[in-house]
Every structure is written in C-alpha cells, then in structure tokens.
Amino acid sequence: MVLLYILIMVALIPMYMTVVQDATFSHPPPGLLIPEAWSGSGSIRLWTDAQEIPVRCFWKLVYDPRIHPETAAIQQGDSIMYMYSGTRFLDYRTVLSALLLTFVFFWRMLSMFDRSRNRFQRACVSIPSALLEVCRQKAIKKTATLPFYGQALYFGIMCLYTAHIVLWDFLNSFAGTLWLITLNLANGTAQIINLRKERHRNRHDEESSWTFGQIVPIVLLVSPLVAAFEDLLSKRSRRALREGSVGNTSLNEVDLTPEPSLTEATTLSLHTRPLIYSVPTSITQSSIASQKSSGTPAQDLIRSSWPYAILFWELHVLLAFMVIWLPLAQSQLFIFRYAYWEAYYAFPAAVGTFWLTVVIAVPFSSIGRSSYPCPKPRRSGLNVA
C-alpha cells in the first residue's frame, strides 16, 4: 500500500501541475525555438539561458519579471491561479490534491490495525463526543437559572454534536471513502483534459495526443476506486459463504447421524435442535447489536432522528455535486477556466449548505423537542434528562 501511495502521488504531478507547463515554457531546455510573438524580440530566436531541469520544482513556480521579462505578458493571465508571494506562485491544486490523497491513505491505512484504529477513534471521535456530552449536561443545569441562555447554549451544542456524529459516521462508511477517492479522481482527470487543450500552438498537437505516459496517471488514480469496490464485493462473498457454510454444516450433522429407534431419534432431535438454530441466532443477535451503536442516549437520539438521515444523504449529494462541478468549472465551458478561486467556490458553498441544514433541522426535529431543557417540566410535558 505504501508503494501504491507513492505511485499515486507521482501520478498527481502531470494532472495538477499546470506549473509544469508554465515552468517548461518559462525555462525551456537549450535549443528550443521561441516564436516572435512570445519572445518579444521581433524574430524567432534561440533560448539558451536555462541550463537546469525545466520542472525542477513541483510545488512552486519561480517567476521574476526582472530575470525573464519575455514571459511576463504570457504568465500574466495565469497568475490568478496562484497566490503571489514575493517571486513565487503557489499552485493550490497540487496542495489540495496531495492533502486529500494523503488523508484518505493514512485514514484507511490506520483503520487496518486494531491499536491505531482504537487510538484514532479515541482521539477524533470519543474525546470530542465526551466533551460535547459534558457541555450538554452543563447546559441543562444552566437552564434552571438562565432559561434563554441555557436553551441557546444547548441548541448550539446539539448542532455541533449532530454535525460531529454525522460527519464521522459518513467518513467511516464505505460510501464516504468512495466519494473522497472519486473527488480526487475527477479533479485530476479534469486537469489532464485541460492540459490536452493546450493554448500554446507549438505544443498543441503533442499535448492533444494520448500516449501511454498520459494514460498511466488515470489508471493509477482509478486503482484505489477499483480496490475499494473489490473489497466490498469480497466482503459480501465471504459473508454469503460463511452463512452458507454454517447452515450446511448443521444440516449435514443432522442428516448423517443414525436413528436406530424412536427413543434415540427423539433424544437426538433434542440435542441437535439447539445446534441447528443456535449459531444463526447468535450471528443475528451480534449483527443487530453491532448495528445499534452502544453510544450515549444523546447519540442514539441523534442517530434515530430524521435530521441525521437528511444530513447523511445531503453529504452524498454535495460530494456528487463537487465531483460534477470541478471538471466542468475547469473546462472551456466557463469563462473563469483559469480563475482558481471562482472554480472552487463550491467548497465553501457546500460547507455553508451543510451547516445551514444543521441549524434549520435541529430545532424542528425530535432532537429539539425531546432534548431542549425546560425549567418547568409540568407546563411543557418534557422530562429533563
């Protein structure tokens, strides 16, 4: 898996690195002919002042108009994609893709081992949940003296509590992993397609042709998605095989046992009947117990409410929108193809939509009706827990 992670990180370079094409153009290898429209000298001349590797920096594009004044007009239209810091432009697409891929890799890698999985769950899930539970209890106590302040505080805590549970349940689900991988794949594929639509005419024909080296990055990015589907199918097949083997073993034990007389057959049936039904019953009970989370009453209340279901499926819709929007926003269908922040406005829009749903749904749900502390239980008919 570590080798696969390294290969995917390498595959991200030609996908997200528009700085590679700009650096190659800004520092072309010796012997490259520059047309007069780009050279600014009035004629085609030979570029010989670059002796290093053109793509020496994968994260930043070194640009200084004083050193290369010819490229100032060319890169002026692309500078909006980078954050200008001194004489360096930082490509956030590379940073975003690398962070997303690294998070998904280490998150799923740590979940493979019991010790790391338990530590991760304790640090990111259990401890914040315990703190929110303590704050919830304190808000209930403050309601007796400060009703309005206590209810407002309780409302804010329950909003955070609900969002915390929904997000981590979504990330722990199989669909959450697939959506994160698909989001990275869609963004990277859009970058490859955009690079094929090269605006520099001297490289348009070469960049428009798909070769083995251009297809390999897509194959490497698709591999985690294929592995995730394969893992899902293998789990289902193993579960079906295990259930079938349990049933066949119990039936075979009953069929192969001799029944010499009626008394022995009755005794045999009394002994074999628990053997037949005990294993499937225990499996069913364990699966039901695992489905019912052994959390606090507040967590069980949140998971059984309708805002939890709405928010859970809303995350699916928002990530599906991001998967569709990012390739379209970076294509030639939009004017702001080279405006990075305009193309990525969907990220804060998705976050804002999620929190707006949380704020609207929580007070009108069973969470608000049954959990809001009230200083006068007889009047409201609510029991303070």
From Swiss-Prot:
Reported function: Part of the gene cluster that mediates the biosynthesis of elsinochromes, pigments consisting of at least four interconvertible tautomers (A, B, C and D) that have a core phenolic quinone to which various side chains are attached and which play an important role in fungal pathogenesis. The non-reducing polyketide synthase PKS1 was proposed to iteratively catalyze decarboxylation between acetyl-CoA and malonyl-CoA subunits for polyketide chain elongation.
Chain segments annotated as transmembrane: 94-114, 148-168, 209-229, 309-329, 344-364
Coiled-coil regions listed: none
Lipid bilayer topology: Multi-pass membrane protein
Protein name: Elsinochromes biosynthesis cluster protein HP2
Transferase keyword on record: no
Compartments it resides in: Membrane
Organism annotation: Elsinoe fawcettii
Highest taxon, organism lineage: Eukaryota
Residues glycosylated per entry: N187, N248
Signal peptide extent: 1-22
GO cellular component, one term: membrane
Gene giving rise to this polypeptide: HP2
Keywords from the named record: Glycoprotein, Membrane, Signal, Transmembrane, Transmembrane helix
Induction per the UniProt record: Expression is up-regulated during nitrogen starvation or at alkaline pH, conditions highly conducive to elsinochrome accumulation.
Main location group: membrane
